[in-house]
Amino acid sequence: MATPLPLVFSAPKRGMPPAHFADLSDEQRIEALSELGLPKFRLNQIARHYYGRLEADPMTMTDLPEAARAKVKDALFPTLMEPIRVVEADDENTQKTLWKLHDGTLLESVLMRYPDRATLCISSQAGCGMACPFCATGQGGLDRNLSVGEIVDQVRNAAATMQAEGGRLSNIVFMGMGEPLANYKRVVSAVRQITQPSPEGFGISQRSVTVSTVGLAPAIRKLADEDMSVTLAVSLHTPDDELRDELVPVNNRWSVAEVLDAARYYADKSGRRVSIEYALIRDVNDQGWRADMLGQKLHKALGSRVHVNLIPLNPTPGSKWDASPRERQDEFVRRVIAQGVPCTVRDTKGQEIAAACGQLAAEENSEEK
């Protein structure tokens, strides 16, 4: 049996990129412009280009003095990431991009187009330190936290793609690589930039942003106190501590009861329904009695402020884990609903391009070895 990986909460400091416009406060931006000999009002112009027009190259910002554009680019807009692989599925409605960062680490984002919306799944860390055994990213370990700029620029890239198609990016889910609440300050800063109206941000509604977590209970409570209305998604995966200690090792630190108590605090503070993510794994966590227990615990802890998303597992190559058969999925849904908790099977757009978190990066790394 493979030795379990240790939990890693503190990311290595190495490899962080040069400061980007999105990393800086307004005061820091004004100071940087002043050092370039540019007045304060240029900040508003640059912000409107970046957040409003989705431009990241000052050479195209024609209302800036021509002589200053290269200096602004060097000082505030370093190249953060380059696409090295793009894979499409679902009649090109799902697009997964593998990005190489300045230090060679990899991250992924997935753009999913639906008839009524466009959703971007973004990464908050390069790798992940939560060590969940059925997750490709968790088994790869944590390289480092992403900077605010690296998180925000995933959104700008996708928003620009949708704009070029005559559409609009409407939803953001922090469900890519990494544990968002383990990179807390940067994720919260990124959420504020994603949701503030132009020229301070991209103007996406907070209610259209989902932040996921494997259950860092103190950070869930801290997020509740930020007075934001983003959706909280808790990756629970089983209702009992005995199995969750194995599937989600952070459960050894914060139990199911502690996580659900923190989720209730978030629901009470935000007024938002909490989403419970549950990856159905054949013969591991898909038993009917676990569905009953899940529904009972969620109804007791969260009442009407909860919804269960069942996720058919995306098996990783060589893994012992496999997805539950459809009939067992349907039975699980029926039994959770019978406990008074809404439950649906999540659409698995992009399954054929390994759209589960970390799988494209894992494939790339194995090809390089």
Curated annotation (Swiss-Prot):
Pfam families (UniProt xref): Radical_SAM (PF04055)
Domain Radical SAM core: 114-352
Root EC class: transferase
Gene3D superfamilies hit by this protein: 1.10.150.530, Aldolase class I
Cofactor: [4Fe-4S] cluster
Amino acids binding S-adenosyl-L-methionine: G178, E179, S212, S235, L236, H237, N314
Stored InterPro entries: Aldolase_TIM (IPR013785), Methyltransferase_A (IPR040072), RNA_MTrfase_RlmN (IPR027492), rRNA_lsu_MTrfase_RlmN/Cfr (IPR004383), rSAM (IPR007197)
Catalysed reaction, written as an equation: adenosine(2503) in 23S rRNA + 2 reduced [2Fe-2S]-[ferredoxin] + 2 S-adenosyl-L-methionine = 2-methyladenosine(2503) in 23S rRNA + 5'-deoxyadenosine + L-methionine + 2 oxidized [2Fe-2S]-[ferredoxin] + S-adenosyl-L-homocysteine; adenosine(37) in tRNA + 2 reduced [2Fe-2S]-[ferredoxin] + 2 S-adenosyl-L-methionine = 2-methyladenosine(37) in tRNA + 5'-deoxyadenosine + L-methionine + 2 oxidized [2Fe-2S]-[ferredoxin] + S-adenosyl-L-homocysteine
PANTHER family: 23S RRNA METHYLTRANSFERASE, RADICAL SAM CORE DOMAIN-CONTAINING PROTEIN
Additional information: Reaction proceeds by a ping-pong mechanism involving intermediate methylation of a conserved cysteine residue.
Protein name: Probable dual-specificity RNA methyltransferase RlmN
Organism in which the protein naturally occurs: Corynebacterium efficiens (strain DSM 44549 / YS-314 / AJ 12310 / JCM 11189 / NBRC 100395)
